[in-house]
Amino acid sequence: MLDSLKQKKNFQRIKMRIKTGDLVKVINGKDKGKTGEVLKTIPLENRVVVKGINLRTKHVKPTQEGETGRILTEEASLHASNVMFFSKDKNLTSKIEYFIDKEGVKKRRLKKTGEVID
């Protein structure tokens, strides 16, 4: 699927404000209201994988004789628009904005409270 995205003429990589390791809250879908840590971001598809959210079961056939099949549960990706950054300290969700501090370093902060993330 990634190859087909790259072959499009007007293809642009989407800038994601959510990073790996951020705590996010699901704002839409079957897991609405749950919070979890971002395990992986997929910027080419604008998707994120969140720990313990959007679980899928996968049935694996045995590969060798004497081995039994297994049922695995793994996290599937969510669209980035369905999650929002969650602040544990303030217990609220907020959009993220970028700013440049006095030393000239680009940082992220919450739009609602102004709390600096990193």
Swiss-Prot record:
The alphabetized UniProt keywords are: Ribonucleoprotein, Ribosomal protein, RNA-binding, rRNA-binding
Per its UniProt record, what PROSITE patterns does this chain match?
Answer: RIBOSOMAL_L24
Q: Which GO terms describe its cellular component?
A: ribonucleoprotein complex; ribosome
Q: Which GO terms describe its molecular function?
A: rRNA binding; structural constituent of ribosome
The UniProt entry, under Pfam families, shows: KOW, ribosomal_L24
User: One biological-process term from Gene Ontology?
Assistant: translation
Which cysteines are cross-linked by disulfides? none
Span-the-membrane segments of this chain are none
Report which superkingdom the organism of origin falls in: Bacteria
SUPFAM superfamilies noted in UniProt = Translation proteins SH3-like domain (SSF50104)
Family, per entry: Belongs to the universal ribosomal protein uL24 family.
Subunit details: Part of the 50S ribosomal subunit.
Its job: One of two assembly initiator proteins, it binds directly to the 5'-end of the 23S rRNA, where it nucleates assembly of the 50S subunit. One of the proteins that surrounds the polypeptide exit tunnel on the outside of the subunit.
The name this protein goes by in its record = Large ribosomal subunit protein uL24
Name its species: Prochlorococcus marinus (strain AS9601)
Upper taxonomic classification of the species?
Bacteria, Bacillati, Cyanobacteriota, Cyanophyceae, Synechococcales
